[in-house]
Curated annotation (Swiss-Prot):
Belongs to the uracil-DNA glycosylase (UDG) superfamily. UNG family. InterPro entries: UDG_fam1, Ura-DNA_Glyclase_AS, Uracil-DNA_glycosylase-like, Uracil-DNA_glycosylase-like_sf. The gene is ung. The active site is at D71 (proton acceptor). The keyword Hydrolase applies. It comes from the Bacteria. It comes from Xanthomonas oryzae pv. oryzae (strain KACC10331 / KXO85). It catalyses: Hydrolyzes single-stranded DNA or mismatched double-stranded DNA and polynucleotides, releasing free uracil. This is Uracil-DNA glycosylase.
Length: 241
């Protein structure tokens, strides 16, 4: 068992489906890389117990929607294991502000006073980054080190073993990762990334949130409540907050 396997435990339903990847040579190489970076003083985010937080929050059989991100936020205290999300009290990042703007325009839901998306995850929205770690101040520092193999395996397993999921693919990176998705089995919505650099090219106005709920309701599945409680009412259990 590698150090990472010993320290981080996958949620049981996910471990049964994709835990085999933790035993492969890619994981051993990734574990060695993470140890080496920490040995030279690199600050790795998110903290170890939160690396697999997306899986803890949304068990395999409870997934309704998948939002694919790229890699974690690289600022102090930002990343906590859910793509696009930050802990309560951390300033809302620009991409998430645009997500909130689209939700408001699409559904009339007012922007919340925080960037904590755990309530979505607990309803079945898997907030999955392609790369699960990063280093302070170095965006993309852990790309092409092995995480992509694991998260590809996650997407492929969902594609194969579930049916009727909604995949929200924002930006070329997410859309490339989502090429394996069988659109006869699942609903895929694509748009530019919500970053301020690209949101105006088609993310704003995409109506993905209402379209997602319409798809779920057509299948007899309860829709996602995209509203978020105010910060002073949040349940931050297991969030590291």
């Amino acid at each position: 068992m590698t150090e990472v396997e010993a320290r981080i435990q996958l949620e049981p339903s996910w471990k049964a489906k994709v835990g085999d990847w933790l035993l492969c040579s890619q994981m051993q190489e990734l574990s060695a890389f993470l140890r080496q970076r920490k040995a030279v003083g690199a600050r790795v985010f998110p903290p170890g117990p939160q690396i697999f937080a997306a899986f803890d929050a949304t068990p395999f059989d409870q997934v309704k929607v998948v939002i694919l991100g790229q890699d974690p936020y690289h600022g102090e205290g930002q990343a906590h294991g859910l793509c696009f999300s930050v802990l309560p009290g951390v300033p809302v990042p620009p991409s998430l502000l645009n997500i909130y703007k689209e939700i408001q325009d699409d559904l009339g839901i007012a922007r919340p006073d925080h960037g904590y998306l755990m309530p979505w995850a607990r309803q079945g929205v898997l907030l999955l980054n392609a790369v699960l770690t990063v280093e302070q101040g170095r965006a993309g520092a852990h790309q092409n080190k092995g995480w992509e193999g694991f998260t590809d395996h996650v997407v492929e397993t969902l594609n194969r073993e579930r049916e009727g999921l909604v995949f929200l693919l924002w930006g070329s990176y997410a859309q490339s990762k989502g090429r394996v998705i069988d659109q006869a089995r699942h609903r895929v919505f694509k748009a530019p990334h919500p970053s301020p650099l690209s949101a105006h090219r088609g993310f704003l106005g995409c109506q993905h949130f209402s379209k997602t709920n319409a798809h779920l309701q057509r299948r007899g599945i309860s829709p996602i409540d995209w509203s978020l409680p105010p910060r002073n009412e949040l349940d931050t259990t297991s969030a590291g907050a």
